[in-house]
């Protein structure tokens, strides 16, 4: 356990940031999952909407420091590729 006052503050700060990051990661994963479900259902219009939301979520993840920019680019590329396959 932390002994100094500053170490105790840091533990609390880390806990808060961890919660915030978990929430943001969960929202990101949910957006991606919903897009993939729309792709599985072959609903092109719904997939288009869900793709846009997923891409925005990924970009927000980068700006919040949850994802590395290269990871985000890779995920966006893969999602776009899946969308292009169903739209032919």
Swiss-Prot record:
Family in the record: Belongs to the bacterial ribosomal protein bS20 family.
Pfam families assigned: Ribosomal_S20p (PF01649)
InterPro entries noted in UniProt: Ribosomal_bS20, Ribosomal_bS20_sf
Source superkingdom: Bacteria
Tagged with keyword Ribonucleoprotein: yes
Cross-referenced NCBIfam families: S20 (TIGR00029)
An example molecular function term from Gene Ontology annotations: structural constituent of ribosome
Listed SUPFAM superfamilies: Ribosomal protein S20
GO BP terms: translation
A GO term from the CC aspect: small ribosomal subunit
Function: Binds directly to 16S ribosomal RNA.
The protein, known as: Small ribosomal subunit protein bS20
């Amino acid at each position: 356990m932390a002994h100094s006052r500053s170490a105790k503050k840091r533990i609390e700060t880390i806990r808060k940031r961890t919660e915030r990051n978990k929430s943001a990661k969960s929202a990101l994963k949910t957006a991606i999952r919903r897009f993939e479900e729309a792709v599985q259902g072959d609903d092109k219009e719904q997939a288009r909407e869900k793709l846009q939301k997923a891409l925005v979520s990924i970009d927000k993840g980068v700006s919040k420091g949850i994802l590395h920019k290269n990871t985000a680019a890779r995920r966006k590329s893969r999602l776009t590729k899946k969308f292009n396959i169903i739209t032919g």
